[in-house]
Amino acid sequence: MASSFIVVPFAPAHLPALADLWVATWARTMPEIDFEARRPWLLEHIAKLHGQGAETHVALDAPAGAPAGFVIIDPNTGYLDQLAVAPAHWGQGAAEALMAAAQHRAPAGIALDVNQDNPRAVAFYQKLGFTIASAGQNPMSGRAIWRMEWRPAA
């Protein structure tokens, strides 16, 4: 069932729900990794990114008002650090709404890193016009990643 989403700027009150959502999303995507153990890292990482100028935008499920997902984008560099959508909202438009917000904040282009073994995410970004620019390795997990980039149409 499709939902409608409202994208709002991050507020500190969102943080506990966003951390829960991030853990649940990644636990579903890569169950072999203990993302609950990475929760403290996420909280510190978000604070660090915000201190460096990045912004978090939150997709709220319009009927319920609960966070359905979030995106962290640095409008100065165009680097998208996090995109997470609760599994209950996969395929309902939350990720697209969040990416539209990111593209609005970084209209010159966006770069991101995605795990090569996350075909759902790779296909999603390709559907939005992202292309693979290079290969690398995630410094935390050691997993192979793609650097993907989006540029607006000329």
Task: Locate the predicted segments by residue.
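Conserved active-site alpha-helix within GNAT-family acetyltransferase domains
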Residues: 96, 117-134, 140-144
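Active-site acidic-Proline motif in GNAT/NAT acetyltransferases
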Residues: 86-88, 92, 116-117
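Terminal substrate-recognition subdomain of acyl/acetyltransferases
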Residues: 147-154
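Acetyl-CoA-dependent GNAT
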Residues: 9-88, 99-101, 105
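Conserved N-terminal entry element of GNAT/NAT acetyltransferase domains
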Residues: 1-13, 154
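Conserved GNAT acetyl-CoA-binding A-motif
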Residues: 105-117
